[in-house]
Amino acid sequence: KKILALVAILAIGLGSVNAQESLRWGVTAGMNSSKYSNDFLNSRTGFHVGVKAEMALPQVAEGVYLEFGGLLTSKGAKFNYGSLVNLKLNPYYLEIPVHMGYKYVINENFAVFGNAGPYAAIGVFGKIKAKADLSSAGGNIDWEEWGIDPSDLKGEGSENIFGKDKMKRFDLGLGIKTGVEFNQKYQVAISYDWGLLETIDDSDWKNRNLMISFSYMF
């Protein structure tokens, strides 16, 4: 509820200044492929959704603009070792990117753009999920002959991903984006974010996130 309220407030705030010719706002959503900066975990598929705004800066140069907004975005990674171990890290962040960009208008119905800049994010919720089945690790071993109940070699569980001695809530990073715009309303873009902060103390786990976005500008 808090997340929806923040997104709604941002949308209302942007809408209240939409009368200014230099600013327009829109909605955006898409798919993520996220991982961490180490080689231990694999990427996972997620999503993002939110609002965005573009403010033209003709006083700087024609085509230059500032892009900012608010996104609810999933990040994290996963690890699978056959059927033995399955681990998923599913953190969700409220992210605020602020990018400087340039848009080249080819004609009134088509333009290409690119932008880059920092983002700040706060972790809002998420789970660590783990599942293990070590009963098949011994091949044809009859565990009962060894006095081991095979069910004792299986287990699963989950817990909150953020908190003390867990993942840090705050993240800061850099992002780059490129895309195309149709009819001055529809945008398709691809972007990549590099987290600059360790998500866990004394680790090399920094967020990495590839996003494909679809936006509608009002």
Q: Could you say what each language-model-derived stretch is?
A:
Residues 3-12:
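Sec-dependent N-terminal signal peptides
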Residues 14-19:
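Sec/Tat signal peptide C-region and signal peptidase I cleavage site
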Residues 21-23, 43-47, 90-96, 110, ...:
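Residues that define the transmembrane beta-barrel architecture of outer-membrane proteins
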Residues 24-26, 32-35, 40-94:
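Glycine- and aromatic-enriched membrane insertion/assembly motifs of diderm outer-membrane
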Residues 27-31, 49-55, 70-72, 96-102, ...:
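Residues on the lipid-exposed face of transmembrane beta-strands in outer-membrane beta-barrel proteins
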Residues 35-43, 75-92, 123-171, 203:
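Extracellular/periplasm-exposed beta-strand and loop segments of Gram-negative cell-envelope proteins
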Residues 59-64, 110, 184-190:
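Repeated loop/turn-to-beta-strand initiation elements of outer-membrane beta-barrel proteins
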Residues 71, 75-78, 91, 151-154, ...:
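Predominantly the C-terminal beta-signal and adjacent terminal strand-loop region
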